[in-house]
Every structure is written in structure tokens, then in C-alpha cells.
Amino acid sequence: MTEVIETKEVENIISEQSLKTESVKVSNKRSRDDEEMKDSEGGVKKTSFPQISVEDTEEEQIRKVTIPFNRIAPLKANWQQIYEPIVTHLKLQIRMNTKTRKVELKTSKSTKETSALQKAADFVHAFSLGFEVNDAVAILRLDDLYIDSFDVEDVKILKGDNLSRAIGRVAGKDGKTKFTIENVTKTRIVLADKRIHILGSYSNIRVAKDAICDLIIGSPPGKVYAKLRTVSSRIAERF
């Protein structure tokens, strides 16, 4: 009996100690909350960190863009047009590594813009996909341009002549259909075999992609043109 009474007393003491510790934690939490409320009511300024510039980073940043075999010759022919905006405006260093087939981009001491390296990489990548230099250089000037790539078979599984006819419907006679979609949606489109690349703003890419998907499925071009004009007019009214 005495042992049972002693164990009960020990349990009571332990429970009392645990309650005390919990009450201390709650009171500490309340005091912290009160201090935070006082700071917010008193108008205490929050700590603000200055914006990091490229000069603050000690290490040089490097980006490499792989160039496909079929774009090496156009790259050599248009190297001056690619080289000038990257070096002159973005203040980056650029070189072509012929062994690895990669364009190497590197920041320098004169680089001021933090997003310069990413913009240059996107510009070179757009050219490697097949876009003209005059179209791809818009990535350096505008911030809201993107590239959306997809396969024809992602829309509809086609093989052989059916696949060729679907690509032909997207291109049109002498590229007329593709040019019409580009002009109406203010985008640029590259047909690289089964792969399709679209350069433009998010909303315009969506309209152009819907039109291309309709053509792949088998919709007549006249119907696609009418739908394009109505959708593009709505976008123009909205913005």
C-alpha cells in the first residue's frame, strides 16, 4: 500500500511540473506576440536588403548553349549580328566552342544587368531552334516573350503520309497559312520536322497554338482563319 501511495505522489508531482512548463511556454509565446504587435503598431520599419548587382558577385557566371548540327552554318553566317547585341548592350563575353558545339556566355566586370546572362542564353537558344536573328533579338528588348515547343504527335498520333499532310496543313501553300497565323497573332513560328516552336507573348502563343492544333486535327483553313480573327480582336480589345 505504501509503495502504491508513493508512486501516485510521484505521478502527481510530474504532472504538476509538466503543467508548469506548458504554462511557461504559453506565456513566453504570448509575450513574443505582444512584442510583435507593439512593433507593428509603433510603426517599426522592417529590415530591407539592398538589391544585389552583378558587381557584388565575386565569381564570374557562365552559361553554355548547345547548337545543333544544322544550325552551325547559319550561326557562322550570322555571327556578327549575334555577337554585337550581346557584347555591346548586355556587356557579356561570348565565344563559340567548335569542339563541344556550344556557345559560351560569361559575365564581365562591365556587366550591370543581373538578367543579362539569362537573356543572352534565351536569345542564342531561340536562334538554335531555327528563329531568324531579327526575330530572336526581340528577347533582348522585351521581357514578356517566351518560347513554347511541342510535337505534332502531342496533339494527334499520326504517322507516314498523315503526319506529312498535317505538317503541310500548318505550313500551307508557300507558307501562306503559317504567315497568316504569325501576322494575326503577332508571333513567330518555326516548323522543324515534327517539332513546332512558337515565339511570342503568353496570350498570343496560346491563340497561335490553338490554331495550329486545329489544323493538325483536320479543321479547314478558312474556319481556322475566322476563329483566329475573332479571338485576336477580343485580345486587342482587352489590352
Curated annotation (Swiss-Prot):
Keywords assigned: Nucleus, RNA-binding
Main location: nucleus
Region of interest called Disordered, as start-end residue ranges on this chain: 21-45
Gene3D superfamilies membership: K Homology domain, type 1
Ranges annotated as biased composition (Basic and acidic residues): 30-44
Localization annotation: Nucleus, Nucleolus
Molecular function terms from GO: RNA binding
Gene Ontology CC: one annotated term: nucleus
Cystines in this chain: none
Domain KH span(s) in chain numbering: 160-212
Assigned protein family: Belongs to the PNO1 family.
Function: Part of the small subunit (SSU) processome, first precursor of the small eukaryotic ribosomal subunit. During the assembly of the SSU processome in the nucleolus, many ribosome biogenesis factors, an RNA chaperone and ribosomal proteins associate with the nascent pre-rRNA and work in concert to generate RNA folding, modifications, rearrangements and cleavage as well as targeted degradation of pre-ribosomal RNA by the RNA exosome. Positively regulates dimethylation of two adjacent adenosines in the loop of a conserved hairpin near the 3'-end of 18S rRNA.
Subunit structure: Part of the small subunit (SSU) processome, composed of more than 70 proteins and the RNA chaperone small nucleolar RNA (snoRNA) U3.
Name the record gives this protein: RNA-binding protein pno1
Organism: Dictyostelium discoideum (Social amoeba)
